[in-house]
């Protein structure tokens, strides 16, 4: 079982509440295999991996928001292409 102290992660994010939200979002991505882990998995659960990534400064709110915006833009582009093909 991995032991993770959250103090370093809290310092990276700002407060415990935002840390929980960011770690939960990242853990969900890892659990659903939407994104690959940025640190070695070492047989850890997604929540532990997410906390380790935050602690190392690899993930934060800005990075998560940018990823989601990029995915939304790509999805919108695909949908617009599909609509244009249907209207032809």
UniProtKB/Swiss-Prot annotation:
<dbReference type="InterPro" id="IPR003716">
    <property type="entry name" value="DNA-dir_RNA_pol_omega"/>
</dbReference>
<keyword id="KW-0548">Nucleotidyltransferase</keyword>
<dbReference type="GO" id="GO:0003677">
    <property type="term" value="F:DNA binding"/>
</dbReference>
<dbReference type="GO" id="GO:0006351">
    <property type="term" value="P:DNA-templated transcription"/>
</dbReference>
<dbReference type="Pfam" id="PF01192">
    <property type="entry name" value="RNA_pol_Rpb6"/>
</dbReference>
<comment type="similarity">
    <text>Belongs to the RNA polymerase subunit omega family.</text>
</comment>
<dbReference type="InterPro" id="IPR036161">
    <property type="entry name" value="RPB6/omega-like_sf"/>
</dbReference>
<keyword id="KW-0808">Transferase</keyword>
<comment type="function">
    <text>Promotes RNA polymerase assembly. Latches the N- and C-terminal regions of the beta' subunit thereby facilitating its interaction with the beta and alpha subunits.</text>
</comment>
<dbReference type="GO" id="GO:0000428">
    <property type="term" value="C:DNA-directed RNA polymerase complex"/>
</dbReference>
<dbReference type="GO" id="GO:0003899">
    <property type="term" value="F:DNA-directed RNA polymerase activity"/>
</dbReference>
<dbReference type="InterPro" id="IPR006110">
    <property type="entry name" value="Pol_omega/Rpo6/RPB6"/>
</dbReference>
<comment type="subunit">
    <text>The RNAP catalytic core consists of 2 alpha, 1 beta, 1 beta' and 1 omega subunit. When a sigma factor is associated with the core the holoenzyme is formed, which can initiate transcription.</text>
</comment>
<keyword id="KW-0804">Transcription</keyword>
<keyword id="KW-0240">DNA-directed RNA polymerase</keyword>
<protein>
    <recommendedName>
        <fullName>DNA-directed RNA polymerase subunit omega</fullName>
        <ecNumber>2.7.7.6</ecNumber>
    </recommendedName>
</protein>
